[in-house]
Amino acid sequence: MDTPLDMLEQLEADLAAADHDESATGVDRRQFMFFSLVAAAASTFGARGAGAQGAGAQGAGALGSLTRGAAQPPQVTPVALGNGEAPALQFMPYPGGTGALMEKLVREKGAAAFARTPHAVEKWSGAVPTNPDDLAFLPAHRISALIKARKITSRQITDIYLARIEKLNPTLNFVVTLMASQARAEADAADAEIAAGKYRGPLHGVPYGIKDLFAVKGVPTTWGSADFKDQIPDYDADVVVRLREAGAVLLAKLATGLFAQNDWWFGGRTNNPWNTNIGSSGSSTGPGSATAAGCVAFSIGTETQGSIVSPAIRNGISALRPTFGRVSRHGGMVLSWSQDRVGPMCRTAEDCAMVFSVLHGADEKDASTVTTPFQFDRNLSLASLRIGVDSAAPKELVDTLRGLGMSPKEIGARPTVAGMQGGGLNVEYAAAFDFYVQRKAKEIGLDLNMVYDPTRTGNGAYGNNRPARPAGVGPEATNPMAAADWNPRFLGGRTARGFEFVQNQRRRLLLVSKWGEFMKDLDLFIAGPNADVGPNAQTGHPCAVLPYKFDVPQFGGGGRGADAAAPAPVYKAQPICGVITGNLYNDDLILSVAHQFQKATDHHTKRPSFA
């Protein structure tokens, strides 16, 4: 029979071996062994200690009771989680929190703060274009005016867009699922309602496309991955419901880069209509390409960190990345509960305002959402606005706005907070896609507990230390992003300590506060096109993208939203875009300023020769 000393020596050996097991089960096993080791030690020393046998027995008994209560690994099976279940913690961009924001709005505006103001579309005047291409490239708010005046029908413009999709999509590759029959039925229903005097508002009968991250009942929702090409939801995302209730006509599910990154998806790369030799950037790659090509009146994109801004710039269109929490993400694929946003991608700033007026507002299915005022001002005066400009701001954009009455002031570098480590995004990625990683690991024989390299951090902890993905395994094998993007993106956050994640969130709130201080004397600012994509994404500030000149672009390589490694492309002339960043919840103001610029210029009216 083993003596307590024998047991002690064996437990010491077992505990040393268990120290290398990083799994949850391994942690439970180490805890069990630790308590057992302490109990054995107490028993050993109690038995050998002269005059202390009673105390030793007492200690062994007490610790034995402790180990009996805590020694066994938990037998409860955790509730399975998919992609959509949100954590209890919610990010709020307003430094004082939701309650303080609501009190401020009520104090300043009363009940009007929560009123939903429909966008007022100007009446159509003049001749109606007879060329289908001219109709297709009209801004969405002009198509709306024509439909309301019954100068064209929803079915007419829907058929024009469907014909253009059939013609251009084989080259541009922006459609994942074409919904032609459903679109025609929705257009006919819209025409019947309008003829009967039941006009729903400015989006009634206007055709659009939506990024294939959003659930549409009975329609495949692929997230850019062939692993999910047969995923057919039985419900509609909130944005789909709002747009349907507004009478908009859904033409197609538009491409998203694989799991919302880049412009590659399981159907290949989505291309830029201004230059089909390059991608349209991502991850809202289909919305960017389809809108620029005149194949939808407007589209809906999403962004975690650059995925609206980057494809809007790449394709030379107008777009709004709204203040965090203004549009519901319910029914959309999750990458980050604390950074994901939904916004319109359009031909003009007024189009963005018209669409956003329908999209925004609180939704009980998305706890991050709030209702705040939105009032687009078509005739805004720039004279009284506090506008900041930095040295990298596009000269053409600044000079035109100055000529319209803007008096800019110089601003310096935007606030940063050291040590944020991406704000914990990898942890959110890993949590949102744990269900998928577990499944894929089983398919290819990847041991998630054995590939971790504790000497490295973040994604790198899994980089060179994980087995190579077998050739041809997985539906993304044709995607050049897959080798780099499949596992590290969702694996890196699995090893983060809860302590580190909380510290990141504390630093993020410091960043939010610093930005609040920086913006307190500004209504908006203009900087270089990509200067603040990262910090803005973490603080929740809104920005508008707009073309400000026509020239040969110099798109940078690498980084989020850039093309996969390839020979340097030859760029061709296209609209070049700038970015206007606003204060929290001033989405209406930055779109109104962008509209003043577009009234004075025509860069947003240019069309790709290919289309």
Where in this protein do the model-derived segments appear?
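N-terminal secretory signal peptides and thylakoid transit peptides that target proteins
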Residues: 20-40
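Gly/Ser-rich, acidic/histidine-flanked active-site/gating loops
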Residues: 136, 141, 169, 205, ...
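Glycine-rich, small-residue loops and helix-cap segments
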Residues: 150, 205, 245, 249-251, ...
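Short glycine/serine-rich loop/turn segments
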Residues: 203-342, 528-533, 560
